[in-house]
Amino acid sequence: MAGKELERCQRQADEVTEIMLNNFDKVLERDGKLAELEQRSDQLLDMSSAFSKTTKTLAQKKRWENARCRIYMGLAVGIALLILLIVLLVIFLPQSSKGSSAPQVQDAGPASGPGE
């Protein structure tokens, strides 16, 4: 009876030992996976930081390009308006000055002298 009881306790101890070894192996495997996940998360963090810097740099570059384009367009419109103003002044100013500077002769009808 004591031998059977001892055998049963030994089997239970062996089962518990086997379960503990399996659990220990699973913990080691899980630890390896966690380390890999941590490494991947660090890589993703680095990549997101680089992406953020690149995005900010690109946005700033595009803003400057857009501002430069607006400045060039404003200058082009300003120059076009200036040229149009000069052309209009050249066309209309000499005609109005010729008409006002030349003596105007008014026709008073048939010439009547003092003796008539």
UniProtKB/Swiss-Prot annotation:
InterPro entries hit by this protein: Synaptobrevin-like, V_SNARE_CC, Vamp5, VAMP5_R-SNARE
Transmembrane segments: 73-93
Cytoplasmic side: 1-72
Signal peptide limits: none
Bilayer topology term: Single-pass type IV membrane protein
Topology feature Vesicular, residues: 94-116
GO terms under cellular component: Golgi apparatus; plasma membrane
PROSITE patterns: SYNAPTOBREVIN (PS00417), V_SNARE (PS50892)
Domain of life according to the entry: Eukaryota
Modified residues (Phosphoserine): S41, S48, S49
Keyword line: Cell membrane, Coiled coil, Developmental protein, Differentiation, Golgi apparatus, Membrane, Myogenesis, Phosphoprotein, Transmembrane, Transmembrane helix
PANTHER family in UniProt: VESICLE-ASSOCIATED MEMBRANE PROTEIN 5 (PTHR47462:SF1)
Family membership noted in the UniProt record: Belongs to the synaptobrevin family.
Name of the protein in its database record: Vesicle-associated membrane protein 5
Organism: Bos taurus
